Amino acid sequence: MVEIRRDSWGVPHVFADTLRGVYRGYGFAVAEDRLFQMDMSRRSFTGRVADVLGADYLAFDRMVRSNYTPASIAAQIVALGQEDRDIFEGYAEGYNQRLAQVLANPAELMPREYLDFGFQPTVITPEDVAMVWVGSLANRFSDTASEITNLMLLGECIEAHGAEKGRAVFDALRWRNDPATPTTVPREDHDGPSPQHWPRTNPVPLSKAAAKEWMELERLRLGAFAADLEPRASNIWLVRPERVAEGKTVLVNGPQFGWFNPSYCYGIGLHGPGFNIVGNTPFAYPIILFASNGHIAWGSTAGAGKCVDIFQEHLNPQNHRQYRHNGAWHEMQSRRETIEVRGQAPVEIEVLSTHHGLVALTDHEHHTAYAKQRSWHGKEIESLLGWIGSMFAQDHASFPAQIARKASMVNTYFADRQGNIAYALAGQYPDRAPGHDPRLPADGRGEMEWRGTKPFATNPQVVNPAQGHIANWNNKPAVDHDNTCTFVWSAADRLSEIELCLPATATVEQLWGLIEQTSSST
C-alpha cells in the first residue's frame, strides 16, 4: 500500500510499509510533478540529448559519453543486494507507472514541453535513477581537475616572462596554502601543518591546438567558459543549544545553485517503516540532501577536496594508441559508443582509456595524452548508498560510518536534538607519491603512481567545536588543507561574513534570518 498526500504547499509526502513502496511513491510523485525535467536530466547525465533535440547537442553527448563508463555503473547496480536494489527499482516502477498514465491520456496529461519539442517520454531504468546522481554529483561536481588548465597557464607565464620568472609568477597565482585563510574546522580543534610550496615538476607543455580543444571541452562541461560563470555554491551554519535562546540545536543550509524554473531542488517527505524523512534535494535524487528525520538533521555544501588527478601519458610517436609505463609500451583500451541523433544517422565515437582512467585529451603535436584517475571510480553506487544510509541514522554514533562510505567529495554536516553538531569533508583522497605537484599533470610513466587512498579519519572534520558553532561558505576546511582545483583560498574569504553575523547568543528566528544577509544573487 502506497499513499501520497500533499501538504498545503503541494509538497508530496509518501507513506508506505516497505522501503520499495516508499521509493515507488517517490518516483510516481516526481513523474507527476517534473516529468520533462527528470527526463532531460537523465538524458543529460547519460549523453542522450541529441536523440531528441538533434545535432546541436552531439558535441555535448560526445563529451558526456567520454567521461564515464556505463558498464561500470551497470555492474555496480547488478551487484547490489535486494534491499538496495529496491531503492532504484521502486523509484523506476513508480515513475514508469505515472508515465503509463500520461501516455494513455496525452491530451490531458502530457507536459507542454514534449509538444513543443516534438518527442515522447520513455520509460526509465534503475540505472537511470542512479545516473541522475552519478552524472551530477560524481561525474561533474566530484570531477574537478584543473591540471590541464594550469599547464596552459604555466606555459603562458613562461612564454611571457621566461622559465624562472614565469614559474615564480605561476606559483604566485596558484599558491599552495595561506595559513591566514579562515577555516571551517577551528584552529584550536585542528592544529595541522601548513606547508607553503609544492615540489617542482616539469610536464611536457601543451600545444596551442590541444589547449583550444580543452577549452571547448570545459565550455561543454560547465555550460559556459569558466570566466563567464556567476559564482555559485552553498553556505551553512550550525549552532549548539548553549548559544541559542530557545536552547535548541540549529542547522541552516543555504544551497546556491542558481535560479531555475522548475526549481533545481525537489521537496519530498518519505515516511516508511521506522523513518520519517522530510526535506529537498537536487534533481529528485534518491538521497534527500537537505533534510531531517525527526532525530537528526543534515546538510551539504560543495566540497573542495582533490580526488581526481590528471596523468600525462607519453605516447609512442609512431602509434598514439600506445603509452609508456614502467619502461614498456602499453596499448590503450578502447570502447565504441553509438550516439543517436534526431534527424540524421547515428554517430559512432571511440572512448580511450589507460590504466589510470579515461583519456580526457590527446595532444597529437606533443605526443601526450591526459588520463583521469578518480579515487571514486567503481565506487559511485556505494557512495550514493552511504549517503542514503545516513538518512536513517538516529544519532551521531551511526552517522559518520555512513559518510565514510562516500568516495566522492562533498562537505557534510550533522545536527541532533541532543545538541551535537559535526562537519566532515567526505570523500576518499589519494595517497600520492613524493614529488607529486597536484596543480599540474603527473608523469604517467610510473614514478607518480598513487599508493592507495587515505583513511576517512585523515579528512578534515570536527564534532562539537569549543566555539559552539560550525560555518562554511565553500571555504578552506582546515588549516593544513591545501588549495584545490575548485578554490584558491586566501585570508580574504566570504566565510568572514557569516562569522561576523553570528551573535554570541541568538534566537532561532535570528539564525534563520541570517540567510537574507548571506545569499548570493544566484
Residue ranges: model-predicted function:
Residues T368, S408-A504:
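Hydrophobic alpha-helical segments
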Residues N139-A145, L151-A168, A209, E380, ...:
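Ordered core of a single globular domain
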Residues V2-V250, P255-N261, G274, T281, ...:
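Substrate-recognition/specificity elements adjacent to catalytic centers across diverse enzyme folds
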Residues V22-G25, A71-F88, Q373, L384-S390, ...:
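Second-shell loop/turn segments in exported
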Residues N276-A345, I388-F392, E499-L502:
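Compact, glycine/acidic-enriched structural inserts
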Residues A79-Q101, I236-E242, G247, Q256-G258, ...:
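Structured, non-membrane catalytic/scaffold regions adjacent to prosthetic-group chemistry
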Residues V123-V134, A138, C265-L270, A304-C307, ...:
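Short secondary-structure boundary/capping segments
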Residues F15, Y23-R24, W133, G247-K248, ...:
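Short helix/loop capping segments that flank catalytic or ligand/cofactor-binding pockets
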